[in-house]
Amino acid sequence: MTAKHNQYVMALDLGTTGNRAILFDYEGNIVGQAYKELTQFYPKAGWVEHDALEIWRDTKTVMQEVVQKTAIQPQQIVAIGLTVQRETCLLWDKTTGQPLHPAIVWQDRRTAHFCGELTAAGYVDEIYERTGLVLDAYFSGTKLHWLLDWVKQSKSVDPANLLAGTIDSWALWNLTGGKVHRTDHSNASRTMVLNLDSLIWDEKLLDLFTIPAQIMPEVQPSLSYFGVTDPEILGVEIPITAIFGDQQAALYAHGCDRPGLLKCTYGTGAFLVANTGQTVTRSQHRLLSTVAWTQTNRDKSLTRDYALEGSMFTAGSCVQWLRDKLGLIESAAASESLARSVDSNGGVYFVPALSGLGAPHWDMNACGAFLGLTAGVTKAHLVRSVLEAIAFQAREVVEAINQDSPAPIQQLKVDGGACNNDFLMQCQADVLGIPVERPAVLDATAQGAAFGAGLKIGWNQLQIRFFRTFHHGTISLICLQFLPMRIQEGVSVDQ
């Protein structure tokens, strides 16, 4: 046994609904984890906020809890990888470390009117050309504009003392004791102010959104050295060697390292991301062009991987809505058995627009709806129609990716809590007409962050783990493969 077998990498997965710390060993196995649920705040219709101090407190707590649970010594943790919910952003005071306003969450729609004004002023094409993003309230740029407007109205705030950032920047700043204000290319590419070609903050867009360049974090490669943790957290300094947006981390974990490979994470929303290689692919179907990840080579050159993404704002949250607001199910897991209890949706169809519609429609004003209601409809039909809507929503995006990308999608790799639902996964395979592969490890976001951090410090064994677990055509460690019904019946996909 080598010294590396007594070493561990910690993944910090700071998501929309909760924050986790997971420890991985040298073989890529999970040896322990801790989790804290995150409070959601809805101060007005269409507004969604998080308490940034709660995010940091919980991050620190889960780091300490996972060490205590596993009895691993902090000095055995040789690297940390960080992955976060994207687009969510905030401002904070760099002297006191206090947030100036609750973090505005990616689902928040308060800037939809401002987006409409920019659309009317003719900025849609220019923003897409510079950033690869659709002009929408989803992204950080308009949120930061709103926050800065709010700051101007507060006489108690010193504008010269501001720092801005997405959740990775906020977490990194706190992890390093306020010493490091940086972000990585994957998170920066979701702000709507990063130039997708030059990979630096775009001065024209900063001016458009009235964001001072000096308050923005420094941008660096996803796999690189981001500093060390404050020893007050775990008693030792631990290097932070990888940062990803959550969906890019999942893509990395699935080994989707070349064009034609696609993953879908079913969480609060559903996010389909396809690697498009080292050049930007521009979509003709309103998909997002984004940075997958970046890393520096030994000769100091930068390797960049780009992706096409279809973001769907509601997926697992639709099931939560059935549970929490309508009371149709007692748990998310109960949706599967209830959907199977009927042979069809009974003619009921659901429009999954509880937070507007994302790709490929990008309709900020769309609302959800049940269609086809009759006296014979039961709650089972309603639940089944919601699960089917998630699958058909994903099909729209896959069809758009196939039209935009020269490499056709042959299979879908999945992760996230909602993909535990076998009915949903089988429905997904049926409507796509391609196999759906669900790995044994569903924590792909955390796994991607940990693997990236480990590989950066020379844990080459993890590269072998990539190919054993996720390599195209390999299912040795796949928990379950869902085949379309027509393949099960002996009909090829091409037919």
Curated annotation (Swiss-Prot):
Residue numbers binding ADP: 16, 20, 268, 316, 417, 421
Sequence positions that bind sn-glycerol 3-phosphate: 16, 86-87, 138, 246
Coiled-coil residue spans: none
InterPro entries: ATPase_NBD, Carb_kinase_FGGY, Carb_kinase_FGGY_CS, FGGY_C, FGGY_N, Glycerol_kin
Enzyme class of the recorded protein, top EC level: transferase
UniProt GO MF annotations: ATP binding; glycerol kinase activity
HAMAP family: Glycerol_kin (MF_00186)
Similarity comment: family membership: Belongs to the FGGY kinase family.
Protein name: Glycerol kinase
